[in-house]
Amino acid sequence: MGYSLGIDLGTTFTAAATATGDRTDTFSLGNHAATIPSVVFLRDDGDVIIGDVAQRRGQEQPDRIAREFKRRFGDATPIMLGHTPYSAERLMAAVLQLVSRQVSERNGGPPDAVAIAHPANWGPYKIELLHQAAQLAGLGGARFVSEPEAAAVHFAAGERVDEGDVVAVYDLGGGTFDAAVLRRVGDGFETLGEPQGIERLGGI
């Protein structure tokens, strides 16, 4: 049976979940936790490593590590890892590719569908850049959903939310704050009004 993959690449941590039929499971990306740090480290040989290992290596060579690069999404100024310039989109693509590879290896093949969450206040420009990052990661067919919408879907998986019910979502992440009001429609949600967000307000 095929499966779907959802990815939340946050400012500080990245998480993933898989869905098969009516069953949804958190996918353990790290060795000791479900999430991994959204951190990229450039090795001396030019390869990048991601997550917990990158975090440890960055303590030894802090000039070769990138953290919180989601906040730089759409910024034309490159992020320097050592002497190598990287865009935030390229770093995000590296994390997405790692997640996709781990999930595909453990599930015996690639997912049938992929959804990637993004902050509610991202406009068409940043969503297009996210699409480009997904393409670089081999996820060109991914669907993009706002983080409040993804949170509402997760909530509805465990609580009764009837057709037409309205929910308010307040999402305080590591680097961004989003708020949105959504109405249950069929198997999903529609956003009412304009979602609001503060891009540099979070838990870090």
Where are these regions (language model features)?
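Oxyanion-binding/catalytic loops of NTP- or PPi-dependent enzymes
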Residues: M1-R71, M80-L81, P85, E105-I204
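Adenine-nucleotide phosphate-binding core of ATP-dependent small-molecule kinases
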Residues: M80-R101
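Amphipathic, well-packed alpha-helical segments that form the structural scaffold of globular domains
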Residues: K70, G74, L96-S104
